[in-house]
Swiss-Prot record:
PANTHER family given in the database record: ARABINOSE IMPORT ATP-BINDING PROTEIN ARAG, CARBOHYDRATE TRANSPORT ATP-BINDING PROTEIN MG119-RELATED
Protein name: Arabinose import ATP-binding protein AraG
Binding residues for ATP: 40-47
Matching InterPro entries: AAA+_ATPase, ABC_carbohydrate_import_ATPase, ABC_transporter-like_ATP-bd, ABC_transporter-like_CS, P-loop_NTPase
Catalytic activity annotation: L-arabinose(out) + ATP + H2O = L-arabinose(in) + ADP + phosphate + H(+)
Protein's cellular compartments: Cell inner membrane
The organism of origin for this protein: Shigella dysenteriae serotype 1 (strain Sd197)
EC number: 7.5.2.12
Gene: araG
Protein origin, superkingdom: Bacteria
GO cellular component: plasma membrane
The ABC transporter domain, residue ranges: 8-243, 256-499
Subunit organization: The complex is composed of two ATP-binding proteins (AraG), two transmembrane proteins (AraH) and a solute-binding protein (AraF).
Family the UniProt entry places it in: Belongs to the ABC transporter superfamily. Arabinose importer (TC 3.A.1.2.2) family.
Length: 504
């Protein structure tokens, strides 16, 4: 039940950076014993607000009110001492120190300048037990999993008696089991009467945890949903992006050209039976299937990431011998991989380098000198045309959001002579607004005659974007559906594993 008096209030919060107004007149309330979700596209202002709450930034206008008292934090330590803790996506812990040392860093119990390790480990053990964690407090942090690191960060907040705990995209690096454990802990913290702020683009998490949802757009407050029985996915999307859900996908019927890509009885590691399919010029074909269906494995084989063990790939009626990715690229077939951070981007290189790295070889001067003029113009062109949000082309790509990293990878392939593009989970980990931009790029590629084959486990996305849906099940094709005729029931029915009959 919502209390009459909020524990945390934002009153007219504004934040201006040189040339940029990040927040404008943000006002809303949060209550003790509730999980209050913050939603919005990248750049909507969620993280900026958390940094104001945590003392990283001072507001340009407005104030933060905690338990009826107007607060002004000079730094994060002041905020933490006032009971405010932020659990960021990138955890702020020291791997070489023990679990207990990390929990009580800055307030280690000591006497005469000597740390009382017995008391330290005892107190840390109590915090870990509170979270249901069976971890030896004397274990060096570096030996723990990311999920356990997160629990240590939460224990650190509890050790400082935090009454307000904010989570910023906390599940991005967690396994399903670790996510379940995190949700258990958050629900316990809610029962204890703490204010929980939760930032995520994953709507299934928002609906599973939240008692209220506040939506931001372009640095402004849009609305707060407090009746979770009356809010649904479509209403949230419309509040976040100002468009109906149908407009997010934006599919329209189009005409296709001749067959551009054909697989003839292709097998690859993880693909159980020979796969045969065709994609025409200008056609978008979606590959849908549950985990283990073989979608990613098929694409890796087609691109030369693994070896095709049988069958033949054809582009424009010509057989293509693909033994490594450079063979696929030379034939005009490009891949945006599922794991963009490990296989798509070069994290410690600039946006410019990541866009230009594939086509660079075609533009060198004298056969060996990088053509800086072409590289600068090409990168700037794709940054503008794809609306890549970055301070500049020299920004390290690892500092960009997932959506902007994906657009940079697309910019890389747009620099090549593309005939076929393979997209493996192209919008995973991307906010709704960036997804809309990715879909528009896909439609633009199709309009240029590119054959698009994209794999996704997001069924509404496949149904909303693809002209034709190929459903895979356990390494084989289970069936095909046309856009105008397909629905979720049909697609899921085809994707579900067959039930074996037990033999008596």
């Amino acid at each position: 039940m919502q209390q009459s008096t909020p524990y945390l209030s934002f009153r007219g919060i504004g934040k201006t950076f040189p040339g940029v107004k990040a927040l404008t007149d943000i006002s809303f309330d949060c209550y003790a014993g509730q999980v209050h979700a913050l939603m919005g596209e990248n750049g909507a202002g969620k993280s900026t607000l958390l940094k104001i709450l945590s003392g990283n930034y001072a507001p340009t206008t407005g104030s933060v009110v905690i338990n009826g008292q107007e607060m002004s934090f000079s730094d994060t330590t002041a905020a933490l001492n006032a009971g405010v803790a932020i659990i960021y996506q990138e955890l702020h812990l020291v791997p070489e120190m023990t679990v207990a040392e990390n929990i009580y860093l800055g307030q280690l119990p000591h006497k005469g300048g000597i740390v009382n390790r017995s008391l330290l480990n005892y107190e840390a053990g109590l915090q870990l037990k509170h979270l249901g964690m069976d971890i030896d407090p004397d274990t060096p942090l570096k030996y723990l999993s990311i999920g356990q690191w997160q629990m240590v960060e939460i224990a650190k907040a509890l050790a400082r008696n935090a009454k307000i705990i904010a989570f910023d995209e906390p599940t991005s690096s967690l396994s399903a089991r670790e996510i379940d454990n995190l949700f258990r802990v958050i629900r316990e913290l809610r029962k204890e009467g703490r204010v929980i702020l939760y930032v995520s683009h994953r709507m299934e998490e928002i609906f599973a945890l939240s008692d209220a949802i506040t939506v931001f757009k372009d640095g402004r407050y849009v609305r707060t949903f407090t009746d979770m029985q009356q809010v649904d996915h479509d209403a949230l999307v419309q509040a976040m992006v100002g468009r109906d859900i149908g407009d997010i996908y934006g599919w329209q019927p189009r005409s296709y050209g001749e067959e551009r890509l054909r697989l003839d009885a292709v097998k690859a590691p993880g693909v159980r039976t020979p796969i045969s399919l065709a994609v025409r010029s200008g056609e978008i074909v979606g590959l849908f299937g549950l985990v283990g269906a073989g979608r990613s494995e098929l694409m890796k084989g087609m691109f030369g990431g693994t070896q095709i063990t049988a069958g033949q790939v054809y582009i424009d009626q010509q057989p293509i011998d693909i033994r490594k990715p450079s063979h696929a690229i030379a034939a005009g077939m490009m891949l945006c991989p599922e794991d963009r951070k490990a296989e798509g981007i070069i994290p410690v290189h600039s946006v410019r380098d990541n866009i230009n790295i594939s086509a660079r070889r075609k533009h060198v001067l004298g056969g060996c000198v990088i053509n800086n003029g072409w590289e600068e113009n090409n990168a700037d062109h794709h940054i503008r045309s794809l609306n890549i949000k970055t301070p500049g082309a020299e920004q390290l790509i690892m500092n960009l959001s997932g959506g902007n990293q994906q657009k940079a990878i697309l910019g890389r392939w747009l620099s090549e002579e593309m005939k076929v593009i393979l997209l493996d989970e192209p919008t995973r980990g991307i906010d709704v607004g960036a997804k809309h931009e990715i879909y528009n790029v896909i439609y633009a590629l199709a309009a240029q005659g590119v054959a698009v084959l994209f794999a996704s486990s997001d069924l509404p996305e496949v149904l909303g974007v693809a002209d034709r849906i190929v459903v895979m099940r356990e390494g084989e094709i289970a069936g095909e559906l046309l856009h105008e005729q397909a629905d979720e029931r049909q697609a899921l029915s085809l994707a579900m594993p067959k039930v074996s009959q037990a033999v008596a």
